[in-house]
Regions:
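Membrane-integral, polyisoprenol-dependent glycosyltransferases
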Residues: 2-183
Length: 183
């Protein structure tokens, strides 16, 4: 039985391939990430019960300036840290003339998720070397559970950034301990 291999071992007959440079890959990844983050942020009303509770907490900050203990209408104690409602209230005040309050709060998720993507990319670059940050960002974007939860009004989005920054600090510790302690 005879096998015939038609392979050009020297590369004489191969057609020239156009290769993409690193800057082009970074630009394409940034465009993909921006489109992915912005896709579900505006245009839909809060449909999960936790979203309306968080909108109520942000509107309590906006209307009565209760920055000490922002509470939702049905709460008597603080369940989540107030950083997410504070940033959401800032976005509501900035974009109140253009967007509905729940859309402005969702727009603050752009900041949280962008910083999370950057932190994950830096952590991966620190652990595995240059060129792997984009791959980790693509894996992060492709996570099934993330797609449903990133575009909602939840304080867990800011906690995700905290975890990503902590992991980046742990990865950076051996090479630059002072900078890692600042992260």
């Amino acid at each position: 039985m005879k096998f015939e291999l038609n392979h050009d071992w020297q590369g004489n007959m191969s057609s020239p391939r156009s290769t993409l440079g690193d800057k082009t890959k970074i630009h394409l990844f940034l465009i993909l990430a921006i489109v992915w983050v912005f896709t579900g942020l505006v245009g839909n009303s809060p449909w999960i019960p936790a979203e309306s509770e968080n909108v109520s907490m942000v509107m309590d900050i906006v209307s009565s300036n209760s920055i000490i203990a922002p509470l939702a209408a049905s709460q008597d104690s603080i369940n989540n840290p107030p950083l997410y409602p504070f940033i959401g209230a800032t976005f509501v005040k900035i974009f109140s003339s253009i967007l509905a309050p729940h859309d402005a709060i969702r727009l603050s998720n752009f900041i949280w998720i962008s910083l999370t993507l950057v932190s994950i990319g830096l952590m991966t670059r620190e652990l595995w070397g240059t060129g792997f940050g984009r791959q980790a960002g693509l894996i992060f974007i492709a996570s099934i559970g993330l797609i449903f939860n990133v575009h909602t009004i939840r304080p867990e989005v800011s906690a995700l950034l905290g975890f990503a920054l902590a992991l980046y600090g742990f990865a950076l510790y051996y090479r630059r301990p002072f900078r890692a302690s600042l992260v």
